[in-house]
Amino acid sequence: MRTLLLVAIGLLFVFAANGQTAYVSKVKKWRADHQTELLSDSGWFTVAGLFWLQSGVNTIGTGPEYDIKLTKNFEQGKFGEIAFANGSALLTVANGVEATSGGKPISSINLIDDQKSDPTTIIVGSQSFFVIERDGRYAVRLKDTQNEPRLNFHGLKWYPIMPKFRVTATYQAFAQPMEVLIPNVLGSTFKMKSRGILRFRMNGRPYSLMPVEEGDHLFIIFKDLTSKTETYGAGRFLYAPKPANGKVVLDFNKAENPPCAFTEFATCPLPPPQNRLNVSIPAGEKRYHD
């Protein structure tokens, strides 16, 4: 009888170890995929500029005299101009400049911003740009596949994967969706809707986070005490599956830096007051820049 008990206990340890190994492997793959996405031809490490559009003519080219400054990889000087008024942007390309959109050559085109369906992207050599809309303001976001931060990438930094930072939260739905004021790096706020609150325990103490919905996931913008020393100072992002039977798994081993951790040309949301936690969560992604 005792022998059987020892065998059973041994098997439990083996199963637990195998389960933990499988979990660590899954998180490692997720982290590798996350890095691949950041470094892709359209990833955040290619972002090379952000230029707010002014009413009237906005010139585009390489050099300090232009309103929208392409990188040095465009060697022809003047690229063209954007005539902007009341959210409408008309691009005219200078004579002799080759540019495409949707795989077709262009000389003039209306630029559809990123908040509408089928936004317009302009390609010129290794660079691309498109119009974004944020809080009623419009800007041109520039990307370059030969961007120096991408070419000089030196690896993401992570805490060791620890299963204890994968916690199960209780999801308490609101009677009605609640509007949450989300601040951003532009100094303004915008409204998002939250349908409930997540309650969980860490180190024996209760905490809560207010998520918003993004596609098929919950999106959590949070900040913890590690932001003072080891993680990005403005906070981090965490995605989680939508609740099942009133429960949500929060895997802080997958906590990730916002785009602003890698480029000054992003327009990141910041944690609302409800999501600033008075606890250290040494899990997930660390600061990219020391």
Model-derived features: positions:
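Positively charged n-region of N-terminal signal peptides that target proteins for export
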Residues: M1-L4
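C-terminal soluble interaction/assembly domains
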Residues: T229-N253, N257-C260, P272
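Flexible, glycine-rich surface segments
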Residues: F165-S227, Y232
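N-terminal beta-hairpin/loop module of FHA
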Residues: A22, K26-F74, L225-T226
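Bacterial N-terminal signal peptides
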Residues: L6-V14
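Forkhead-associated
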Residues: L53-S117, Y239
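Boundary at the C-terminal end of the N-terminal hydrophobic targeting segment
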Residues: A17-T21
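Surface-exposed beta-loop interaction hotspot
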Residues: I123-T189
